[in-house]
Structure formats: structure tokens, C-alpha cells
Curated annotation (Swiss-Prot):
One of its GO terms (molecular function) is zinc ion binding. One of its GO terms (biological process) is negative regulation of cell population proliferation. One of its GO terms (cellular component) is cytoplasm. SMART domains: LIM. The N-terminal and the C-terminal halves of the protein can associate with each other, thereby hindering interactions with ZYX. It comes from Oryctolagus cuniculus. Belongs to the prickle / espinas / testin family. It comes from the Eukaryota. SUPFAM superfamilies: Glucocorticoid receptor-like (DNA-binding domain) (SSF57716). This is Testin.
Amino acid sequence: MDLDSKMKKMGLGHEQGFGAPCLKCKEKCEGFELHFWRKICRNCKCGQEEHDVLLSNEEDRKVGRLFEDTKYTTLIAKLKTDGIPMYKRNVMILTNPVAAKKNVSINTVTYEWAPPVQNQALARQYMQMLPKEKQPVAGSEGAQYRKKQLAKQLPAHDQDPSKCHELSPKEVKEMEQFVKKYKSEALGVGDVKLPYEMGGPSPDKLYIPAGDRSTPAALGPMESKPAECKGTQYFCYCCKLSMKEGDPAIYAERAGYDKLWHPACFVCSTCSELLVDMIYFWKNGKLFCGRHYCDSEKPRCAGCDELIFSNEYTQAENQNWHLKHFCCFDCDNILAGEIYVMVNDKPVCKPCYVKNHAVVCQGCHNAIDPEVQRVTYNDFSWHASTQCFLCSCCSKCLIGQKFMPVEGMVFCSVECKKMMS
């Protein structure tokens, strides 16, 4: 596909998931409606991953594209209709007989993803070692967790220029080079195996029983003498605790096969979340999810959530922004040279702050301007003025004085409090 075609293809898919209910805001959200350049809902300001959007095909396309032109092409299949690579996600279905009073019924459990191993018992064991709330059983909290992490850890706009907003041809080329580089240097998929299946351990992983410490240990290929593995103890690279004999471990090829992880320890070193579908990025001796690997390589715009490939961008409040995206979170007006207030780490212009976020003075019942001094006690605020911060009984100014708060009122003395009770 030539560059012009790629530029024409760019779009954010605003119809996708339209009207889907928000799982976080419930009835407060009118339904998902994608903001025209932010990756959030225009109605409730939550991300698409917080909404009940059916994205299984889209997510499989996204992961399929990630694995395209890598050594992991065995995990994808190209559709005959459009040639788009699709992720061949391994689904595991377990059937358990359940004894009833009259007959035996079958209880079926479907895992929306499972490690692609031939030994289903090993895959089942792997699942049981994950926290219950993170096991991707269809229709469960764990399936919702996986869906959310796919969106969070592997943003489509971190690998596909057509999912980004108004990139220049130069930025498209730079992004394509960046994606090609991380595919060849950092991207990987974990392997689930029993520790002894990977060959001889390194000397620092060898465990010598207390009574035999003077006996030299012989290292050799474990495949040829599997019985020798009983004298070996393996340790998790993350938690440093030992692996129990017979338990599955995760290996990461880019890290080297002398390192292994408990299934629940195979997490991103930045966000500490399980690496979704064991997809990892390896850098400087650490595991990263896709999002946080990219964050370690490129600045990310706090407005549109995309990586910044332009040489010119702005920094404010310890965050990075495209020049055109340093805008009010409420009204989208550009904030360059304007007064703004940070609300939940989002910049808001002064008019929107006064209208939507400002606290109300208990004295005059007007919004308190962000630049004006105020007095705050618990959940109550007052203008720090002789007209507002007054005794609720005798109207004595209380600035710099002791006071008695009672349910939004303040008193200068016990006597005044008694008079109002």
C-alpha cells in the first residue's frame, strides 16, 4: 500500500461500539460515542475499554497485525477475503461431569484464551495459578479483565498509523520504522513449559542439599537425563521464590532461557499487570507491556494518547502533548497562553473550571474562582474574605481566628453555637 493510500485510509472508526453502555458509569453514560481525536467517550470521558463494546474480531486483527512480519506468524492466519492477518487465539474448552440426582450433566468452561501448548493439563494448571479474577473464562470478570488489558497494553494506535489522528507523511514513515524496530528487537511471546524441559540450568539456579555441599554438581543436557532435575531448584526471576516441582513456568526467549517466571509473576515492570496473552516486550533486563515499552522509547501525548513523532511538542504538568492537543479537557479549547487548572491530572480552562468543577462558597453560595484565596475545612469551603468567612450567628469575621464548625456552619464561640441550635 503506497503512502497516499495509507493517508486516505486513516480514520478512528467512530461507528465502532457506538451506543455501548459504560461498565463504570452505568446509566450516567448515554452510551459510547468516540471523541473526534481523544480515545475516550464524549459522554462520560471513560475509555472504550470501559464500555461493553464487542471487539473480539477487531482485537484479533490488531494482534494479528502486531505479529505480521515477525517470527510469530504461526500465531496468525490471513483472511482470504481481504488478506488481513488474524490472530489465531487459542481457546480452551474444558468439560467436567457433574453428578446430579437422576443423571450426570456436563459442565463446560470456556477460556477465551489459553497458552498454545499441546498438553492441555499443563494449560489448565497454568490457568489455576492465575488469580481467579484474572482467569479469562467466557462471561466472567476475568474475560472482561483480559479485554481491558488488550486495549490498554496493546493500543492499536501504537502500531497502525491509520488509527492515529492526522499524521504527516513524515510521521507515518517514522512510525512504521519504529514499529519495525520494536518487532525485531523487543517483541516476544512467552512459552509455558515445565522448568526441566528447557535444558540444563545455569550454576546460580542449582540447588545443593545441605548435606552434600562439598560434592561438585555436574551440569549437562537435561533432556538426556531427566531424573537429574530432581536435585535442581528453580527460582522465579520476578519474585525470587522457588518454583514448585511439576508447576508450569513461563520462559521469554528474548530474556534467555536461564530466566523463568511463575504464571502470576509474568507482569509488566511498569504497571504490574499480567502480560495479556503472554505478549511481552523485553528491554534492559525488564518485561514491559506494549504501552509501557513504547512509553520508554517515545513521548506520549496526554491528550490523544498517541506516541509523538514530531520534533515539536509541549511539556506541561510532567506530561507531553502534541501542540494542537494541549486543550481544555471539557471544551477542547487550546490552552496555550491561557490560565488553566488541573482536575484529576487533566487541564481545564478557567471558564470550564468555574462552571463544572469549582467548589461553592458556604458564605455567598457562589463558585470560588481558582485564583482566589479560600478557606477549606473538611468538605466545606469559603472565600477567604471578610464578607464570606463569618460566624453563622453574629457575622464576626473569622479569618485568622479560632472557630467551631457544625454541618457547614461556623461559629466564633459556644454561645453563638447555642443560639443557633
